[in-house]
Amino acid sequence: MKSIVIIPVFREIGRIGRVLSRFEDSQVDQICLVIDDPIPIIRQEIEEARKTIKTPVTIIENPVRKGIGHAIRQGYSYALSNGYELVVVMAGNGKDDPREIPRLTTPILKQGFDYVQGSRYVRGGRHDKNPFIRSAFVRMFPVVWTALTGVRCSDVTNGFRAYKASLLKDPRVNIWQDWLDRYQLEYYLHYKALTLGYRFVERPVSKTYPFRNKGGYSHISPMRDWWQIVGPLFLLKMGAKD
């Protein structure tokens, strides 16, 4: 099964190079970096890192940032246009470890699953330096998802996932809607996978927040972005969005 990992990148100076350098041979067939607002220092860091690995790296650049959902969709478009059958999505800031990709792809390749969610909270998972308020939210939010979808979830906000590309081509799944340009996309796809009968499982992964200073560990702002994260579940459940 031809595989690709999509990594959205936005000003990950000093981080994206380390992420690339941790890739091991044969984990995936292709790495696709989607870079918003590229600057020379980021390009240089990526070029230096890609020399140290054997996995081919494709780069898509956006002069203006349009949102993480938009960036991931560009990766989807590339993957679908080039015949990739298995898609992995992960962070470009070092929170996710590329060496754990087989934990997500093996259930698809060998056990017949369609969609694999990485979880820091199932046995074997690990989390480090998670900000306190965020930790409280990410533990409580899956309870709501479980109640509304009927599928047990432990780590809905973890963006480290793998799934068959056929999910993206399902006519019941419309990832190209404009309202999915930002964080909504990931939760939209998660809801669709859980409610349309796809074979779903969680597998243990690590999640490490590299910085403890205010605003230094993530581009997400709780006050600004909370509805982009929470909204899709309720909008889809109520039928306000499709």
Each PLM stretch: what is its role?
Residues 1-3, 14, 21-22, 174-242:
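Hydrophobic helical membrane-anchoring modules
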Residues 4-8, 33:
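Short hydrophobic beta-strand elements that form part
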Residues 11-25, 41:
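Short, well-formed alpha-helical segments that are part of the catalytic scaffolds
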Residues 12-15, 38, 68, 97:
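Donor nucleotide-sugar binding loop of glycosyltransferases
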Residues 28-39, 58-61:
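Short beta-strand/loop segment that forms part of the nucleotide-sugar
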Residues 35-44, 94:
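A conserved acidic beta->alpha catalytic loop
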Residues 64, 70-81, 98-179, 183, ...:
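Acceptor/aglycone-binding surface of glycosyltransferases and processive sugar-polymer synthases
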Residues 84-95:
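Short beta-strand-to-loop acidic/aromatic patch adjacent to the donor-nucleotide binding site
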